[in-house]
Amino acid sequence: MSSEELACKLQRRLRLEVRAETDQGDPQPAPCDAPAGHPEPEPPARAPTASADSELNLKLSRRLDIHQGTARPGRSKVFNPYTEFPEFSRRLLKDLEKMFKTYDAGRDGFIDLMELKLMMEKLGAPQTHLGLKSMIKEVDEDFDGKLSFREFLLIFHKAAAGELQEDSGLLALAKFSEIDVALEGVRGAKNFFEAKAQALSCSSKFEAELKAEQEERKREEEARRLRQAAFRELKAAFSA
C-alpha cells in the first residue's frame, strides 16, 4: 500500500473518530413532535470545527510518522540513572546529580540556556549564545530547549565514549567539571568505564559499592566512639 493510499485511509478514519467524539460531547436537543401535516426539517450538516481539524491533523501526522518509522518513541516518565547509565558508579552519579542541582538555579529540574551560560562561565569555558544553543541541541532528546538530568548525564556518557568533537562545548563542560570523570580524563574514562562494566555485572557492582559504603560508615562510627572514650578518660583524669 502506498503512502498516499495509507494517508487517505487514515484521514478518513480519523475524521469519523473525531466527528463521533464531537457528537458525543455536544448535548443533543430533545426531539419534539412535529405538527401534523408538516414534515420535520432535516438538521443542517455539522461543519467541522477548527479544534477538531487541528486534532485530526496531529493524529494523522503522528500515525504517518509511526508507519514510516520516523516517529520518536515516547519516553517513560520514570528515570533510573543506575540502570540507564550502568557504566557510571554510584558515587559518580551522586556527584553529577549534585553538580546538576547546583546549576539548576530555578529548582525546576532543568538547566535552561541562561543557567548553562552561567555554568560554563564558572567552569572557565564561556560560550557564545549560538554555542550554548548548539550544546543543548546536541543532547536535547525531547526538543524542549533545556537540559533534563538524563540529558545532562548523556553529556558525560558521550564524553566517556569519545562521541564528542574536540571543539564541542559539551566536551569542555565534561573536561572542566570538578568530578571523578574529569580526574580520570575524558579519554581515559572510556577504558575505565569499560573495564568496570566487564569486571562486574550491574547488580554485583552496586552490591560491592553498597558494602564499601557500609564499611566506611562503620569505620567512621568506630573512630567517633574511640574519640568519645578518650575524651571521657581525659575528663575523668582532670576531675580526679
Swiss-Prot record:
GO aspect biological process, one term: regulation of cellular hyperosmotic salinity response
Keywords: Calcium, Membrane, Metal-binding, Mitochondrion, Mitochondrion inner membrane, Repeat
Tissues/organs with expression: Widely expressed. Highest expression in testis, followed by ovary, kidney, cerebrum, cerebellum, heart, liver, and spleen. In the cerebrum and cerebellum, undetectable at embryonic stages, expression increases after birth up to adult stage. In adult CNS, detected in neurons of the cerebellum, cerebrum and hippocampus formation, including dentate gyrus and Cornu Ammonis, but not in the white matter. In the testis, expressed in spermatocytes, but not in spermatogonia nor in interstitial cells. In ovary, found predominantly in mural granulosa cells and those of the cumulus oophorus.
Top-level taxonomic group: Eukaryota
Annotated Gene Ontology cellular component terms: mitochondrial inner membrane; mitochondrion
PROSITE patterns: EF_HAND_2
UniProt GO MF annotations: calcium ion binding; calcium ion sensor activity
Residue span of region Disordered: 17-54
UniProt subcellular location: Mitochondrion inner membrane
Amino-acid positions noted as binding Ca(2+) 2 in the UniProt annotation, renumbered to this chain: 140, 142, 144, 146, 151
SMART domains tied to this protein: EFh
Binding positions for Ca(2+) 1 per the UniProt entry: 104, 108, 115
Protein's name in the database: EF-hand domain-containing protein D1
Encoding gene (name): Efhd1
